[in-house]
């Protein structure tokens, strides 16, 4: 029973350690709100990320345009994650 409690504590510490950088990023985004018209269903987002997470397009070295869209990505785009803007979930599409 002690072993189970110790393993659970280690798991909780590991999860908390991973959550702190994500919370810091969310705080940075929340600190700089942008004014976007309500009638615009498309939001342009500029992000910095690890190269390993960048979209891979074979044979192309050009910059890739990424957008946060509702409800889904357009034809030819791929969903790479989720954006949270004004309390709503958006598809992060490139």
Curated annotation (Swiss-Prot):
One of its GO terms (biological process) is antibacterial humoral response. GO terms for cellular component: extracellular space; Golgi lumen. Keywords: ADP-ribosylation, Antibiotic, Antimicrobial, Antiviral defense, Defensin, Disulfide bond, Fungicide, Phosphoprotein, Secreted, Signal. It holds the Pfam family Defensin_propep. InterPro entries: Alpha-defensin (IPR016327), Alpha-defensin_C (IPR006081), Alpha-defensin_N (IPR002366), Beta/alpha-defensin_C (IPR006080). Residues 1-19 form the signal peptide. Disulfide bonds join 66-94, 68-83, 73-93. Transmembrane segments: none annotated. The modification ADP-ribosylarginine is found at residues 78, 88. Its main location: secreted. It is found in: Secreted. ADP-ribosylation drastically reduces cytotoxic and antibacterial activities, and enhances IL8 production. Residues 20-64 form a propeptide. The modification Phosphotyrosine is found at residue 85. PANTHER family: ALPHA-DEFENSIN 1, NEUTROPHIL DEFENSIN 1-RELATED. Belongs to the alpha-defensin family. Tetramer. Dimer. Interacts with RETN. Effector molecule of the innate immune system that acts via antibiotic-like properties against a broad array of infectious agents including bacteria, fungi, and viruses or by promoting the activation and maturation of some APCs. Interacts with the essential precursor of cell wall synthesis lipid II to inhibit bacterial cell wall synthesis. Inhibits adenovirus infection via inhibition of viral disassembly at the vertex region, thereby restricting the release of internal capsid protein pVI, which is required for endosomal membrane penetration during cell entry. This is Neutrophil defensin 1. It comes from Pan troglodytes (Chimpanzee). The gene is DEFA1.
């Amino acid at each position: 029973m002690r072993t189970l409690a110790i393993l659970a504590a280690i798991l909780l510490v590991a999860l908390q350690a991973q959550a702190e950088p994500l919370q810091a990023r969310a705080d940075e985004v929340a600190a700089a709100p942008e004014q976007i018209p309500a009638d615009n269903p498309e939001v342009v987002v500029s992000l910095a990320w690890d190269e390993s997470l960048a979209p891979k397009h074979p044979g192309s070295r050009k910059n890739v345009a990424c957008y946060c869209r509702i409800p889904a990505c357009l034809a030819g785009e791929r969903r790479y994650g989720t954006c949270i803007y004004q309390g709503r979930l958006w598809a992060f599409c490139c």
